[in-house]
C-alpha cells in the first residue's frame, strides 16, 4: 500500500488523529477531509487544520451544515443536553452522519485519485452508535464501490480496539504525547485532557489510565 493514496476522515480527535498517523506510515500520499456540520465548537475545525498542518497533510473542509437541519442533536445544539440514558442512543448520536461522511469522503477520493479511505470508527467503545459498526462500514464500502465503479477500500484501524488499545497504537506510532496534547475529544471543546466530565472525556481518560497502568506493569 506504500505507493498508494489515501483520504482520512478527520475531526482532530484522538481516534481520527491516531488513524491519520497510522495512514502516514501505510501510504505514499495522504490527505484529510474534515466536515463542518455546525458542531457546538469551532475548535474542532481549527484543531483538525492545525494538526494537519503540523503533519504536513492537506486538509479539505466540506460544509455539511444541512445535517444540523435534518438531525438536531447535542453535538450541534446548545439547547440539547449531552446525556446517556440506559437502553437509548446517546443524545450525541447524529443519524446518518457516518453514512454521509463516508459517501462524501469517497467522492473526494474519486476526484483526487485515492483508492483508500480511513475512518476512526470502532465497535468496541462505540457508545451504541449503529453507524460505527463493522457491518455498516462493510456495507457502505460495497455501496460506494457500486455507485462509482471504483475499488475503494475503507479501512478501520480501530474497529476492534478499546480506548486503552487505541492509546497503545498511538504509542507504537511514536505519537502518544502528540495525540494526548494536540487532539480535541471533549464535547465541551477543551483540547487535550478536556473537561473531564463529558462522556467522551471520561472514556478517553479511562482508556489512557488503563494503558499507562498496563505499560508500567511490564
Curated annotation (Swiss-Prot):
The keyword Lipoprotein does not apply. Zn(2+) binds at residues 186, 195, 198, 201. InterPro entries: QueC, Rossmann-like_a/b/a_fold. It comes from the Bacteria. The keyword Ligase applies. Its EC number is 6.3.4.20. Pfam families: QueC. It catalyses: 7-carboxy-7-deazaguanine + NH4(+) + ATP = 7-cyano-7-deazaguanine + ADP + phosphate + H2O + H(+). One of its GO terms (molecular function) is ligase activity, forming carbon-nitrogen bonds. One of its GO terms (biological process) is queuosine biosynthetic process. Keywords: ATP-binding, Ligase, Metal-binding, Nucleotide-binding, Queuosine biosynthesis, Zinc. Gene3D superfamilies: HUPs. SUPFAM superfamilies: Adenine nucleotide alpha hydrolases-like. ATP binds at residues 10-20. Pathway: Purine metabolism; 7-cyano-7-deazaguanine biosynthesis. Its cofactor is Zn(2+). Binds 1 zinc ion per subunit. Belongs to the QueC family. Catalyzes the ATP-dependent conversion of 7-carboxy-7-deazaguanine (CDG) to 7-cyano-7-deazaguanine (preQ(0)). Homodimer. This is 7-cyano-7-deazaguanine synthase.
Amino acid at each position: 500500500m506504500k505507493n498508494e493514496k489515501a483520504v482520512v476522515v478527520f475531526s482532530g480527535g484522538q481516534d481520527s488523529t491516531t488513524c491519520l498517523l497510522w495512514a502516514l506510515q501505510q501510504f505514499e500520499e495522504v490527505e484529510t477531509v474534515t466536515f463542518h456540520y455546525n458542531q457546538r465548537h469551532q475548535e474542532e475545525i481549527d484543531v483538525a487544520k492545525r494538526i494537519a498542518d503540523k503533519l504536513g497533510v492537506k486538509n479539505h473542509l466540506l460544509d455539511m451544515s444541512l445535517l444540523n437541519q435534518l438531525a438536531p442533536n447535542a453535538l450541534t445544539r446548545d439547547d440539547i443536553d449531552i446525556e446517556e440514558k440506559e437502553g437509548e442512543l446517546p443524545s450525541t448520536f447524529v443519524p446518518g452522519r457516518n453514512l454521509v461522511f463516508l459517501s462524501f469522503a469517497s467522492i473526494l477520493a474519486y476526484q483526487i485519485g485515492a483508492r483508500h479511505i480511513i475512518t476512526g470508527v470502532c465497535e468496541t467503545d462505540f457508545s451504541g452508535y449503529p453507524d460505527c459498526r463493522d457491518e455498516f462500514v462493510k456495507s457502505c464500502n460495497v455501496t460506494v464501490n457500486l455507485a462509482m465503479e471504483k475499488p475503494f477500500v475503507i479501512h478501520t484501524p480501530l474497529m476492534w480496539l478499546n480506548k486503552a488499545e487505541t492509546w497503545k497504537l498511538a504509542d507504537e506510532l511514536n505519537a502518544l504525547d502528540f495525540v494526548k496534547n494536540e487532539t480535541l475529544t471533549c464535547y465541551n471543546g477543551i483540547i487535550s485532557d478536556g473537561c473531564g466530565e463529558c462522556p467522551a472525556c471520561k472514556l478517553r481518560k479511562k482508556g489512557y489510565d488503563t494503558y499507562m497502568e498496563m505499560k508500567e506493569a511490564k
